[in-house]
């Protein structure tokens, strides 16, 4: 089943019922995704990034795709170690993969992202 998508059962049910969702992922998709992850975690690549570029990491701490927050934290830590000066990490307790589709939390998360973006625009 696809319970990993959302803590909200109605979101999971909607996903299952939607004929446009749930297509099988191809080997090529996984290959490209894993290549991107490895590329983005190589310190030599991270050190080439603009150190003043703000980066926001948001995820649910129960998202198995991000190893329940561990993978996101590792990426955040790697960015910081590479000298990125403005990295922010926000893990939402109890939430899974589709944090912006969590009906009970979407407004709060959207507001958090908006607040973060606006604060960077003011600099």
Indicate where each model-derived feature is located.
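Conserved alpha/beta-hydrolase "acid-adjacent" motif
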Residues: 64-74
